[in-house]
Amino acid sequence: MLTRRAALLSPLAFAAARTVSFAQGGMTLAMHQNTSSGAGYRGSLEGWARAGIRHVELNAGLVDQFLETDTMAAARRVLTDNGLTPVSGSVGVGGLWEPNPDHAAALETLRRRCEMFAELGLEKVYGSTGANGTFSETDYDAAVDNVRQAGEVASEFDLQMMVEFIRNSAFISTLTTTLRLTRSAGNVQPMLDFSHLLTGLSQLGDLDLIRPGEIAHVHFQDVPDLPRELLTGQTRAIPGTGIAPLTHVLRTLRDKGYAGPLSVELFLYQDDDPYELAREIRESAEAVMMEAGVLR
């Protein structure tokens, strides 16, 4: 019997066309659509492809905007016509992880986003942990069920659900808390964002807690030479232009068995020309990856 995902993709055999394996080791450069969101869905992808980018991370909001005036088939063609492989997607759904009265509605929104991303040939999606409020220790026990339910929704579409911890989240802001929850849930994997790891409450030593093959996806940025109190999403730097210990983290991830995309997610350059920006990012980031010995 066909799964829901297979049924969605079979008309164009899209899953086969878009499947990518990183089993042979090494890491590849990818671009997150948040980095060039001002250019829209088509503009960002076409510009990056001209610059030699082959792996991309999709933003649900940009896909939604594209579908307001075009079709899902057209959205797929933007990927295939430009030789692009979508390696992950941001579902853009709040309230998935922390206990809150709108959790059931959040799961329904997640279900719609998973269906959309499955049609685009993705295998992984993630939700961020941005949350406000005051929480207690018992809330983390309840959160295990929330994490598990999100993983179950994603699995309906043969998607792997991932958690991205956010440095200033009031609920899940560290790698250690993320590992605790994903391990307890059992069906959701942690992902790692360099900026959130290196500028928040996490420590470099926390990387030693990662089990082999546990990290499912990585966002790649540098940190500028600023007082830590001034670091924000807007200060994220192109890999290779800051002071972060990028090669150390990359080598640690390699030793922990990570062999996947490094997706550059920045917010300062969203209105820049996607082609020129991707050229600059590729030159700088791939030099760092080569120095670390992880570039495939």
Which residue stretches match the model-derived regions?
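Active-site acidic/histidine proton-transfer and metal-coordination neighborhood
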Residues: 12, 16-17, 41-46, 81, ...
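Short, contiguous strand/loop micro-motifs
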Residues: 31-32, 61-63, 99-101, 136-138, ...
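N-terminal substrate-binding region of glycoside hydrolase catalytic domains
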Residues: 51-67, 90-94
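Hydrophobic faces of well-ordered beta-strands that scaffold small-molecule active sites
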Residues: 27-33, 56-58, 86-91, 125-127, ...
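Glycine-rich, proline-tolerant flexible connector loops at the mouths of alpha/beta enzymes
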Residues: 58-76, 132-135
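Histidine-acidic metal/acid-base catalytic patches
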Residues: 2, 7-12, 22-29, 38-51, ...
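Active-site-proximal loop/turn and secondary-structure-junction residues that shape catalytic pockets
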Residues: 35-37, 60-62, 92-95, 131-133, ...
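Acidic (Asp/Glu)-rich catalytic clusters
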Residues: 45-50, 67-88, 111-121, 148-156, ...
